[in-house]
C-alpha cells in the first residue's frame, strides 16, 4: 500500500528533515486528509521540535500551525506536543514577518482551535492575532477570495457534527 510506504519513508527520513521539509509534510497530510500513523507521527513531531526553534521561518510556522489545526479539527487527530511549540515561535514573531497568506493561515488555525472543533481553547496566542491576522483574513474575504474547500469543510463540521447553525459568508459591503 502506497500510504504505508510514505509513512515508512517519513520514519526513515525524519532525522534529516529541516524545518521546511517538516512543515511541508504536515501540509501534505492536512491537504490529503490523512493522519500520520503512530511511528510517522512521532517521527514528524520529533523533526518539527528539532528544527522549529532554529530554522522555522514565518511560512513554516504558519503552514505547520494551520496543518496541525486542520488535522485536529477535520480529522480528529489529537494535537501533538509540537503544536504548542510552533505557536510559541509564532508568539515570538512579529506580524510583519508574515505575508498575508501566512497571517490568514494563523487566524484560521486560531479560529479552529479557539472554537474547539475537537480541542477547545487551551493555547496562548500572539497578542496581534486578533488585530493584524484577523485584518488579513477579513481583507481576503472583502477581496472576494473564494472560500477554500477546507473553509467549507469546517463549516460543515460546525453544522453537522456540532449542530451549530453556520454558513460560509462573504463580506459584500466595504
Q: What residue ranges belong to the model's regions?
A:
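Eukaryotic RNA-binding helical-repeat scaffolds
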Residues: 1-174
Amino acid at each position: 500500500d502506497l500510504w504505508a510506504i510514505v509513512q515508512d519513508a517519513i520514519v526513515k527520513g525524519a532525522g534529516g528533515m529541516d524545518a521546511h521539509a517538516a512543515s511541508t509534510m504536515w501540509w501534505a497530510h492536512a491537504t490529503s486528509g490523512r493522519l500520520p500513523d503512530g511511528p510517522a507521527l512521532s517521527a514528524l513531531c520529533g523533526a518539527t521540535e528539532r528544527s522549529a526553534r532554529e530554522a522555522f521561518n514565518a511560512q513554516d510556522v504558519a503552514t505547520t500551525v494551520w496543518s496541525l489545526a486542520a488535522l485536529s479539527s477535520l480529522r480528529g487527530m489529537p494535537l501533538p506536543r509540537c503544536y504548542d511549540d510552533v505557536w510559541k515561535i509564532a508568539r515570538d514573531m512579529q506580524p510583519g514577518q508574515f505575508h498575508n497568506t501566512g497571517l490568514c493561515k494563523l487566524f484560521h488555525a486560531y479560529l479552529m482551535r479557539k472554537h474547539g472543533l475537537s480541542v477547545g481553547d487551551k493555547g496562548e496566542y500572539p497578542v496581534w492575532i486578533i488585530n493584524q491576522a484577523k485584518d488579513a483574513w477579513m481583507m481576503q474575504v472583502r477581496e472576494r477570495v473564494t472560500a477554500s474547500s477546507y473553509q467549507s469543510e469546517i463549516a460543515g463540521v460546525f453544522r453537522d457534527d456540532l449542530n451549530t447553525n453556520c454558513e460560509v459568508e462573504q463580506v459584500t459591503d466595504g
